[in-house]
């Protein structure tokens, strides 16, 4: 035995030879000895082996032992190497070389974190790419290199590379590919939805390559990944694809596998995926980088998902509408999803689902003000004193009033109405019904980028007029009151008093099944004034104290 173990550089311990004979074997190592017990032998081997790990198999009992000199240090190193969180940065956070340098400093200021970094395209790049595509349709192949937006994109990214001190070679292939794609669009004289998705993907592909190259330059090992190459698998709904369940195991296998081999910080493109049938590049809709971040967080089972924006977290209303907007310290996933869906630009509407399913907290922070506490989004929070969390405005909404006496005592009427929308591919936002009528709003984000909008609306009216009287109302806005709807009586009483005082007429009201949202429909030209008045009433007075002073029966009646 001693000879066998010494062959591997192990100083053998003294063994007691007064017990039964046990046969031991390991890969490349065979020996037998008389020992008092496997446990005593293992301790002795541990002291002798130092940093050498031995896997010892006892044929009598099949006991496997893995011994190391410093087990605590080993455990610590294992913890340090584990990916801990996702850090997602939007376009304004990486808008220039200066901003990228600040983001790198921010990431490295958390030495205990081993993040997956998700980046959007540099600010304005996506819009410039789309404008370049539209111009390429009619400019002719020979004039593509004169497109102003193409020149802007080239100059921005080359300048950024120089200012970061990295080689322009990291983006040269993509700049060349972008120009060739635009020439193809010019030759075909059309920009399909599939081509549009491929076109805008160049923004994220270049920003992540520049950022990863900079991290490597300053001595922090990083590796760039295109989301469509690491397993983000989507439907083939170009410009607004949905992520499929097959994504999670694929992403986990790729990122964790690479991380275990090289410990390079992953820098991943947001917003992008790969169609499961077409294998073409798809996009997740505007703001889709948030969804990329939460999807990766769930796939890897990380501790936290951080979404870094240019505002101090989720606010009580849009600061562009009212400068008195305040940060919201805590939200539930349900509240955040409603906020995003009804117009809050700080989060993608679908981004909360993976986080909720994985029960992973989402923290919204300001990359321009990293010391601000931001907003923490979790499954639940203390709602005992909560009244209103935020006020959200969605403009340019179309409203339909559908009236028919056929609804009385009949079944299947609503099914006929909604099958019409399904057939035409139009999404419904808010619904309210009575005995003989339905009022609903149409989601502008689902069809505002498509041509023939009026034609589609005319089709809706034509189909519905076969079964009802239809009134189409344009230029409406949805004002959503997100909060504790168990306080709905108080919220509505106070809200309608404010609106009546300001002469604003509510044309429709709906309380969502989510129990965190009350939606009001008003005219577009009254919407901003409405938000300001409601914000002043709910957030600039002691609303919580007023609620606590209400009679118990009054509160109970609202639940």
From Swiss-Prot:
Q: Which Pfam families match?
A: AA_kinase, ACT_9
**Coiled coil located at which positions?**
none
Q: Which residues bind ATP?
A: 88, 91, 120
* Tissue expr: Highly expressed in xylem of leaves and hypocotyls, stele of roots and in trichomes after bolting. Weak expression in veins and mesophyll cells of caulone leaves, inflorescence stems, sepals, petals and stigmata.
Annotated pathway, please? Amino-acid biosynthesis; L-lysine biosynthesis via DAP pathway; (S)-tetrahydrodipicolinate from L-aspartate: step 1/4; Amino-acid biosynthesis; L-methionine biosynthesis via de novo pathway; L-homoserine from L-aspartate: step 1/3; Amino-acid biosynthesis; L-threonine biosynthesis; L-threonine from L-aspartate: step 1/5
Q: How is its activity regulated?
A: Allosterically inhibited by lysine, but not by S-adenosyl-L-methionine (SAM). K(0.5) for lysine in the presence of physiological concentrations of substrates is 7.4 uM. No inhibition by threonine or leucine and no activation or inhibition by alanine, cysteine, isoleucine, serine, valine, methionine, glutamine, asparagine, glutamic acid or arginine.
Q: What is its EC number?
A: 2.7.2.4
Say which domain of life the source belongs to.
Answer: Eukaryota
Task: Show the InterPro entries listed in the entry.
Answer: AceGlu_kinase-like_sf, ACT-like_dom_sf, ACT_Aspartokinase, ACT_dom, Asp/Glu/Uridylate_kinase, Asp_kinase, AsparK_Bifunc_asparK/hSer_DH, Aspartate_kinase_CS
Question: Which cysteines link up through disulfide bonds?
Answer: none
Q: Which GO terms describe its biological process?
A: lysine biosynthetic process via diaminopimelate; threonine biosynthetic process
* Compartment(s): Plastid, Chloroplast
Task: Recite the UniProt keywords alphabetically.
Answer: Amino-acid biosynthesis, ATP-binding, Chloroplast, Kinase, Nucleotide-binding, Plastid, Repeat, Threonine biosynthesis, Transferase, Transit peptide
Q: Where does substrate bind?
A: 204
Q: What protein family does this chain belong to?
A: Belongs to the aspartokinase family.
Name the NCBIfam families on file.
asp_kinases
**Function comment:** Involved in the first step of essential amino acids lysine, threonine, methionine and isoleucine synthesis via the aspartate-family pathway.
The entry's protein name is Aspartokinase 3, chloroplastic
Q: What is the lineage of its organism?
A: Eukaryota, Viridiplantae, Streptophyta, Embryophyta, Tracheophyta
Q: Quick one: which gene encodes this?
A: AK3
């Amino acid at each position: 035995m001693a000879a066998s173990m010494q062959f591997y550089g192990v100083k053998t311990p003294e063994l007691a030879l007064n017990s039964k004979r046990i046969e031991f074997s390991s890969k490349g190592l065979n020996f037998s000895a008389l020992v008092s017990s496997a446990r005593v032998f293992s301790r002795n081997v541990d002291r002798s082996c130092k940093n050498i790990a031995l896997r010892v198999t006892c044929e009598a009992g099949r006991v496997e032992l893995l011994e190391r000199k410093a087990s605590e240090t080993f455990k610590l190193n294992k913890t340090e190497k584990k990916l801990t969180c996702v850090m997602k940065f939007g376009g304004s956070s990486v808008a220039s070389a200066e901003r990228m340098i600040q983001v790198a400093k921010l990431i490295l200021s958390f030495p205990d974190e081993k993040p997956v970094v998700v980046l959007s395209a540099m600010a304005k790049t996506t819009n410039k790419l789309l404008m370049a595509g539209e111009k390429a349709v009619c400019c002719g192949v020979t004039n593509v290199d004169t497109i102003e937006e193409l020149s802007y994109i080239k100059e921005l990214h080359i300048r950024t590379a120089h200012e970061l001190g990295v080689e322009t070679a990291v983006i040269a292939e993509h700049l060349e590919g972008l120009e060739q794609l635009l020439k193809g669009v010019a030759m075909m004289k059309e920009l399909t939805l599939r081509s549009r998705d491929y076109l805008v993907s160049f923004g994220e592909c270049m920003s992540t390559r520049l950022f990863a190259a900079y991290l490597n330059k300053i001595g922090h090992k990083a590796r760039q990944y295109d989301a469509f190459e690491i397993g983000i698998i989507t439907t083939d709904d170009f410009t607004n694809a949905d992520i499929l369940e097959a994504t999670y195991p694929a992403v986990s296998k790729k990122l964790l596998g690479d991380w275990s081999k090289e410990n390079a910080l992953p820098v991943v493109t947001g917003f992008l995926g790969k169609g499961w049938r077409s294998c073409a590049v798809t996009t997740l809709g505007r703001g889709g980088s948030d969804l990329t971040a939460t999807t990766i967080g769930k796939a890897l089972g990380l501790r936290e998902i951080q979404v870094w924006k240019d505002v101090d977290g989720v606010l009580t209303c849009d600061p562009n509408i009212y400068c008195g907007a305040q940060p919201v310290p805590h939200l539930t996933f349900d509240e955040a999803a409603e906020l995003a869906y009804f117009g809050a630009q700080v989060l993608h509407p679908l981004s909360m689902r993976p986080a909720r399913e994985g029960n992973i907290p989402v923290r919204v922070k300001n990359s321009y003000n990293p010391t601000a506490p931001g907003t923490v989004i979790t499954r639940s929070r203390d709602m005992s004193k909560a009244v209103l969390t935020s006020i959200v405005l969605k403009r340019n909404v179309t409203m339909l009033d559908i009236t028919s006496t056929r609804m009385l005592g009949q079944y299947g009427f609503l099914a006929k109405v909604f099958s019409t929308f399904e057939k035409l591919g139009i999404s419904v936002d808010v619904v309210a019904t009575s005995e003989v009528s339905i009022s609903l709003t149409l989601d502008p984000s689902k069809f505002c980028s498509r041509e023939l909008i009026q034609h589609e609306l005319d089709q809706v009216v034509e189909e519905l007029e076969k079964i009802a009287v239809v009134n189409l109302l344009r230029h409406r806005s949805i004002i959503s009151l997100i909060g504790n709807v168990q306080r709905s009586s108080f919220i509505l009483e106070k809200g309608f008093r404010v609106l009546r005082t300001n002469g604003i007429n509510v044309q429709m009201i709906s309380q969502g099944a989510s129990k965190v949202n009350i939606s009001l429909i008003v005219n577009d030209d009254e919407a901003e004034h409405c938000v300001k008045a409601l914000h002043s009433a709910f957030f600039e007075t002691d609303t919580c104290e007023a609620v606590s002073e209400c009679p118990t029966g009054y509160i109970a009646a609202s639940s």
